[in-house]
Amino acid sequence: MATEAAVVSNPNTLAKYLKLDQKGSIMAEYIWIDADGETRSKSRTLKEKEYTPEDLPMWNFDGSSTGQAPGDNSDVYLKPVAVFPDPFRGSPNILVLSECWNADGTPNKYNYRHECAKLMEAHAAHEPWFGLEQEYTLLDLSNRPFGWPANGFPAPQGPYYCGVGTGKVVQRDIVDAHYKACLYSGVKISGTNAEVMPAQWEFQVGPCVGIEMGDHLWLARFLLARIAEEFGAKVSVDPKPIPGDWNGAGLHSNFSTKEMRVEGGMKHIEAAIKKLEGRHKEHIAVYGEGNEKRLTGRHETGAIDQFSYGVANRGASIRIPREYTAKGYGYFEDRRPASNADPYRITGILMETIYGSVDN
């Protein structure tokens, strides 16, 4: 049986190999999203040079092993869409975020980026800005939140949110390592904080424009999973990892357009919220699995079957920050998405509901 020591990386031993000359070659780590909303990746060797997504070769993988294709027609193709510096292997190595495509030239069933990109392009004149707040829980090898008693529970919520000190936060080293890795890679991470439930953390990405939001959030998720791997930890984006009187985990989504960000913009915010109210069920359908466990009307959430909005109200579906209500322009926050929701689906449906669908 594997021990905890056996699964934790040995960075000191690895370091001497990372310094070796690569003889004019680079390692390109191709990253994609599988059928379960998890990241997968594999590496290939390329000639050293500066790459854009268009310069990079397409690749393929066994989709029958990722839930994305049947065994008798298992090839799924990777189309590069974004390139980032690799914080694990260092320069000049790269991370290559990729879309998944079928052999017949159609987007894979789980390629939500493709439709999102079309919506962003069609409505680009509105200059949509997004900022996503990714909550997550760090688990030990027994799937217990780090720092929780093996046969009990920690003290009630209260001291943990933005907490400092032993007994209030755990695994801050993972959080800081992730922050630095995001900055190195060019991910538009804008902050981190400890969350309300012990062992729960949050990082924020944005503001990002259009399709960039989903790309940067997915890359940040990949980096977090890889870093936690080195520390022998698991990252859970379950929207309600622990039942009972504990906060769930969300992916609060902040949104604005150029019309909302200028004087008189509040009327555009209010018009958008009215449209969101009319498609509440459609949004809930793509806002993450298991969200009914989280959206209960308690623990800073609205009820899953009711749409609501309010100023500075964290128990509403949509929150308008108080300072922007006073100014009369700004942005709003959609608090409904679960922590495991796909950012392409969130940002895509926001654009579709507010500005209309696009033809295939």
From Swiss-Prot:
SUPFAM superfamilies: Glutamine synthetase, N-terminal domain, Glutamine synthetase/guanido kinase. Pfam families: Gln-synt_C, Gln-synt_N. Its main location: cytoplasm. Its EC number is 6.3.1.2. Residues 112-360 form the GS catalytic domain. GO terms for molecular function: ATP binding; glutamine synthetase activity. It is found in: Cytoplasm. InterPro entries: Gln_synt_N (IPR008147), Gln_synt_N_sf (IPR036651), Gln_synth/guanido_kin_cat_dom (IPR014746), Gln_synth_cat_dom (IPR008146), Gln_synth_gly_rich_site (IPR027303), Gln_synth_N_conserv_site (IPR027302), Glutamine_Synthetase (IPR050292). The keyword Cytoplasm applies. GO terms for biological process: glutamine biosynthetic process. It is an enzyme of class 6 (ligase). PANTHER family: GLUTAMINE SYNTHETASE, GLUTAMINE SYNTHETASE 2 CYTOPLASMIC. Homooctamer. This is Glutamine synthetase. It comes from Colletotrichum gloeosporioides.
